[in-house]
Amino acid sequence: MARLILILGDQLSRDVAALRAVQPGDVIVMAEVMAEASYVRHHPQKIAFLFAAMRKFAGQLRAEGLTVAYTTLDDPDNGQSIPSELLRRAAQHGATRVIATEPGEWRLIRALADLPLPVTQLPDDRFLASHAEFQDWAKDRKELRMEWFYRDMRRKTGLLMEGDQPAGGQWNFDHDNRKPARADLLRQAPPRFDPDPVTTEVLDLVAARFPDNFGRLRPFAYATDRAGALQVLDHFIAHSLDDFGPTQDAMLQDDPFLHHSVLSPYLNAGLLSPREVCDAAAKAYAAGQVRLNSAEGFIRQIIGWREFMRGIYFLEGPEYTSRNALNHHRNLPPLYWGAPTAMNCLSHAVAQTRDHAYAHHIQRLMVTGNFALLAGIDPHQVHEWYLEVYIDAYEWVEAPNVIGMSQFADGGVVGSKPYVSSGNYINKMSDYCKGCAYKVADKTGDKACPFNLLYWDFLARHRDRFATNPRIGRIYGTWDRMDPDRQSLIREQAAAFLARLDAGDPV
Ligand code: FAD
Ligand code: DLZ
Ligand code: SF4
């Protein structure tokens, strides 16, 4: 009896578990479906990227002689959801069971489990740590901290290890990083790819079917197959990795990419494997082509943060995205959808997101995320925004970054402190403030940077929770030393700003 082998849009790896299980007579099922394309209103470039990559991947499998039943979005027989397509294909091919690789989202894991056909969900072993390994690591720990997990992953992979010791004698070189960046005309941007006929057909489809989703569809310049993704990797290793470390926390308003790799779309869709990306970085270090602090910082993001976030998502369970530890209920303001704002940092971070479906980590954390947290925005709305607007967004990685790291809505599972800052941090790490209508040096008054007002207001509102936090508790000393009239003025002006935000007035 034929079996169906399910390959989802973010499982485009030749050695994904379900494909390794293929036997003669099996039918590989791939489907562009509205259920996946609309569970949030994804950025049009994200839909186009995945559909083009899916079509090309299917073509490669067919070229190997495998049988692929591929459904395009506009196929009149399309059942428009993964379960309905599996049932339709099972009837068509007389298949009685489905082999899948476990999806990266609880919603789909459950949908497959509920299918009225036997479904085997194989572990997704494209990740370094299995669920069991992460659970084992997490059990009996009072706090789950990425740094300890990361060291285990270094030992496990042998990456940047000299025997049982870390290369250079330290696990983490972040103290050499965190430098601001300067405008640099010679900095190499990631390679751009002109759409080929397959991609152009998909772009036309997306333009017709998703005209109202937030974000520009064209120009579209992402790679959509493994060969292109490998080109992006090679380019990053040759031109940007060496400077990655020092500038990884920097922001420049006219440079959306700096020395970031822009590899997350390819890693998350399966076109590149985390191991090969890290091996390439480690090899460049071993060859003396890049500094250790850059290679280490980059590898940590992948075998540390990326794996840790996935571990948390599966450890915490399906209700994680509903957490709201700080009881925040404000609606996401229209500026997140491109409504004009005088706040230059937000205006640029959102415009860049609209144009590229991309922002780098520190923009996501310290601009859009920081503002949402300071303003007390409902974390579920924030979560949906991030899931919608970024090309690399899948719940397993997006939710722990947003609900956990950025919004502290999980009460401290991911991070030991909330990532909040006044305008001072943004000014130090970027060139946004120079071009802003607000004054970053002003703590109160008409022109005061809203981050300055909201920072203290946030800390004052959440004093009970954070005053005893070992990482930020000390800041309350500064607040307490402030003149009470000044404290009142800050809080009044913060309240007035938030009232304008709620009223939909320009801010
Ligand atoms: P680089 O800076 O070049 O880093 C290299 C790689 O490290 C990335 O490609 C990524 O795979 C990995 N990485 C770095 N930081 C993280 C992290 N915190 N968690 C997981 N992986 C990491 N990343 C996603 O892949 N999808 C998301 O939906 C996503 N949402 C985020 C939301 C918020 C609020 C924050 C603060 C971070 C989010 N991240 C997400 C993490 C990070 O911002 C992106 O991985 C990174 O910006 C992708 O760009 P890059 O490939 O140029 O990364
Ligand atoms: C994100 C996405 C989109 C937009 N469309 C599809 C699709 O049509 N077919 C498909 O198989 N997968 C798609 N995906 C990726 C899935 O949403 C993803 O597999 C789950 O969210 C689990 O990570
Ligand atoms: Fe952003 Fe404040 Fe700087 Fe303006 S002054 S760019 S609002 S941090």
Regions from the PLM with identified roles:
Residues 1-73:
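N-terminal beta-strand-loop-alpha-helix module at the start
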Residues 6-10, 31-32, 71-73, 100-103, ...:
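Short His-Asn-centered micro-motif
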Residues 8, 220, 231, 248-250, ...:
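C-terminal catalytic domain of photolyase/cryptochrome flavoproteins
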Residues 15-18, 40-42, 80-83, 108-113, ...:
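A short acidic (Asp/Glu
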Residues 40, 80, 87-90, 122-124, ...:
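Sequence termini and other peripheral, non-core segments
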Residues 42-89, 97, 102-104, 110, ...:
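N-terminal Rossmann-like or analogous alpha/beta NTP/dinucleotide-binding catalytic cores
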Residues 81-222, 403:
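Beta-rich, aromatic/charged-enriched effector core domains that present basic-aromatic interfaces
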Residues 165-293:
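A charged, amphipathic alpha-helical module
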